[in-house]
Every structure is written in C-alpha cells, then in structure tokens.
C-alpha cells in the first residue's frame, strides 16, 4: 500500500494505492479531494493586576469560532485490471446525494502568568477544542453504495491541552552577561482528538528546556537568541510508541533593526 498527500492553497488531495504481486488481482486506487476557501476568527482578552510592588498576575481567555468551511469533499475509487489495464471508476458522492461539508471546531482557552520582578515567571494554559461536534467523511467498504461515503459523527473526540512553563532571569538589567540570560522550562500534555477503529488515538507528552541569550551591541540591547531542546512522546496502547528529540533555534529581533536611518 502506498499513500501520497498533497496540499496547495486550500486544495487537498490524498491518494491511497493498493497493489498486489498477484497478476490476477486488481489494483485499487482511492483518491480523496477537497477544496477549502474560508475564514477563521480568533478572539482574546487579557488583564494584568499588580499584587504587590514586585509581583503581578496576568490572566487571559481566548475563543475561536467553529463553523462549516465547505470543501465539497469527494472520493474517487479506481479498480484497474492488472492484465488488461481496463479501469472501472466510481465517484462519491453518488448522483442524487447531497454535497458534504467540512468544519472546524469551537476552541476555548484560558491561562494565567505570575511575574515576580521580571526574575521569575510561571504560566499555565488550558485549551479545549470541541472536535466531538465535528463530522468527517468516511468510506465504508462493507456498506450499501448510498452509505459508502458519508459524514461520520463519531470520527473525533474533544481535544484537551495542558501547558505549564517557567522562566528565570537573575537580573534583566544587569551589566553581567550571565545574569541577563533567560532560562526556560516547560511541560505539556495533549489528549487525542482522533478515534482510531473505535479507540483513542495517541496521547502526547512533551518537555522542553532552553535559554535566551541576549545580543548586545552599540545600537541593540533587546534582541535575543533562543535555543531549546524538546522531547516529545506519542503513545497509544494499540500502536508503536514514538519518541522525538528536537533542537529549536530562534531569534527575537529588536525593533530598532527595522528602523529607517535618516541623515539631517
């Protein structure tokens, strides 16, 4: 079995090919397509209150609107005779069936961050994506022709994500280079939103550690080189456990890098 997936500016094409060494067996090709042109709306609010002279607390909430995005998903099944090369094609939805629509879920998030004198920051985020209310087209080979490619209400389940992180900076305005380095660490846990053969998909557990190195010169004192290492564990009881180790490097620019110079 071979699979190929192509995404291009809202166009989605996924091809699955089943071929056999037996020359008397027909090869089977399934081609899933969809075309999406739509919008996504995100809203958020944030409030910061000072707890004391050196301590402050920031809380925030986010909301993403879930709605139908169309797409008109279609399936084309091609059965090819390996000896003669003659192909038989069946396209879904069948004539007389309604066009199907894809959708994105409602998403709700909330979090807080505690800041002690810009030396210690601790934050926690929670995000809920309501995938259980989203339907998805599924092909069933053992169903009647009219029920072979239809919207499935049990394809997904709600996704929960929990994130905890901290940042320590000994002295942000110190003349010492070492004391200006920001040390960061975090963990996250994500529940699966996929239902695989009636069971849960893989759960994700990750941990990361890194630091931000200040870049200092005559005209720039706020740009930071960010380096971090991340371990990600994907685990599902019925499938292979996957462990991934990543190294991330990024650069936060000072806005003065983009200022236009003027000569008077």
Language-model segments: residues:
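Short, small-residue-biased leader/transition segments that mark boundaries at the very start
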Residues: 1-6
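Short loop/turn motifs that connect adjacent beta-strands in outer-membrane beta-barrel proteins
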Residues: 50-57, 119, 171-181, 216-223, ...
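Outer-membrane beta-barrel translocator domains and adjoining extracellular loop/strand segments
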Residues: 10-25, 71-78, 134-143, 195-200, ...
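Predominantly the C-terminal beta-signal and adjacent terminal strand-loop region
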Residues: 31-37, 68-70, 80, 98, ...
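Extracellular loop and loop/strand-boundary signature of outer-membrane beta-barrel proteins
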Residues: 25-33, 94-99, 145-155, 193-199, ...
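Residues on the lipid-exposed face of transmembrane beta-strands in outer-membrane beta-barrel proteins
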Residues: 10, 43-47, 110-114, 124, ...
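Transmembrane beta-strands of outer-membrane beta-barrel pores
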Residues: 8-14, 49, 63-69, 116, ...
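Residues that define the transmembrane beta-barrel architecture of outer-membrane proteins
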Residues: 37-41, 104-108, 156-162, 201-207, ...
